[in-house]
């Protein structure tokens, strides 16, 4: 089939949706499908106003406009998008959306208006905004008009199911991972030293990086001096706040190396012991899945998407509060044999979210979208 991938953001931006949409495009190409992407993100050299760039073999229509802070918004895009979708002979559209995705929502209005079969994947937790969305009614209307709805995890799908109402199927289309790329094998016997904690995240309030450092400080107090080392990978607007906390509290065992490449990320995970995922509103947690694929036990929050690939007490810990996370960290710092057991379990059982499977699930969503339009 010929697929139009529609997303506010795309490479060269490097957020979760951007990278997942790019990787999905690659997987669809490998399956023999034809793929083009449409985005409100400028190209690497500033391309916009509909210019087409090619990223790893995929034509990317840059329907970006000049906006403050290069926001991925273009109120003038729908007319041109409609023309390109009609002339392009697409079989199905796949919209990638978050809590606020004005370009993606404009795209959905266009595809629904054209009668183009449309799949829509939600990469966010809707619980907090579901009442407002319910009043606005647009999500329910799209579902009623045949948009095949999905979310990236069961916890993300549940509020969406309540929003669209009984009788409407909401699927789960998880984020995908290249297991072979992330698996590093058995690291061998661990060298003595502090429990090496790692996280990779955007340093923004929603991801709670400052709260993470504070709870790890509490864990260190429980486990004893020299028991922990924390590396926080990533950049974002809260970096200054986190740096001040580290400096003011004398936490010389907390490191903030910034953003790193995928290759360096994999190497850093392999050299660590435990991955931490403190966000409450994590709809999936692709970085945590990558770390789990390397072998790391993951400590995450109940009610987040981490529960899709972490079972409490089996290959990681799933906790209900920051205090409980601090206790779990301290417990593992005192019990290296338990860390090794969880790591061995992760290495022996690769995650189910392998890209080859996820790509087939995406194609199944496209087939469902076609069936809903023909119904």
Regions found by a protein language model. Name each.
Residues 155, 176:
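Carbohydrate-associated surface elements
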Residues 188-217, 231:
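Conserved donor-binding/catalytic core segment of Leloir-type glycosyltransferases
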Residues 243-260:
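Nucleotide-activated donor-binding/catalytic signature segment of Leloir-type glycosyltransferases, i.e.
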Residues 259-260, 267-272:
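Short alpha-helical donor nucleotide-sugar binding micro-motif in glycosyltransferases
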Residues 280:
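Aromatic "clamp/platform" in nucleotide-sugar-dependent glycosyltransferases that forms part
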Residues 297-300:
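Short hydrophobic beta-strand element within catalytic cores of glycosyltransferases
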Residues 312-323, 331-336:
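Conserved acidic donor-binding segment of nucleotide-sugar-dependent glycosyltransferases
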Residues 338-352:
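A short, well-ordered alpha-helix in the C-terminal region of glycosyltransferases
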């Amino acid at each position: 089939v010929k697929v139009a991938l529609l997303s506010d953001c795309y490479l060269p931006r490097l957020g979760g949706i951007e990278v997942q949409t790019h990787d999905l495009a690659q997987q669809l190409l490998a399956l023999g499908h034809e793929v083009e992407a449409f985005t409100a993100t400028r190209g690497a050299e500033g391309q916009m106003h509909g210019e087409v760039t090619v990223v790893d073999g995929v034509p990317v229509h840059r329907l970006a406009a000049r906006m403050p802070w290069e926001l991925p918004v273009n109120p003038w895009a729908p007319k041109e998008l409609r023309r390109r979708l009609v002339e392009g002979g697409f079989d199905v559209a796949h919209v990638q959306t978050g809590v606020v995705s004005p370009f993606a929502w404009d795209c959905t209005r266009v595809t629904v208006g054209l009668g183009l079969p449309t799949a829509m994947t939600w990469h966010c937790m809707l619980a907090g905004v579901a009442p407002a969305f319910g009043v606005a009614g647009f999500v329910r209307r799209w579902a009623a008009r045949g948009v095949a709805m999905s979310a990236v995890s069961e916890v993300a799908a549940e509020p969406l199911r309540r929003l669209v109402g009984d009788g409407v199927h909401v699927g789960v289309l998880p984020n995908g991972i290249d297991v072979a790329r992330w698996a590093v094998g058995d690291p061998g016997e661990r060298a003595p030293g502090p429990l090496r904690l790692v996280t990779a995240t955007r340093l923004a309030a929603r991801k709670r990086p400052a709260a993470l450092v504070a709870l790890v400080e509490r864990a260190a107090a429980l486990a004893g001096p020299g028991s922990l080392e924390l590396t926080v990978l990533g950049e974002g607007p809260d970096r200054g706040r986190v740096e001040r906390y580290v400096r003011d509290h004398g936490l010389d065992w907390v490191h903030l190396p910034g953003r790193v490449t995928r290759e360096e990320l994999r190497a850093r995970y392999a050299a660590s012991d435990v991955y931490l995922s403190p966000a409450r509103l994590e709809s999936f947690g692709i970085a945590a899945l990558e770390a789990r694929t390397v072998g790391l036990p993951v400590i995450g929050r109940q009610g987040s998407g981490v529960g899709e690939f972490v079972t409490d007490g089996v290959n990681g810990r799933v906790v209900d509060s920051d205090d409980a996370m601090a206790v779990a960290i301290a417990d593992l710092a005192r019990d290296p044999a338990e860390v090794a057991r969880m790591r061995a379990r992760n290495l022996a059982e690769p995650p189910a979210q392998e890209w080859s499977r996820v790509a087939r699930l995406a194609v199944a969503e496209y087939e469902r979208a076609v069936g809903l339009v023909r119904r």
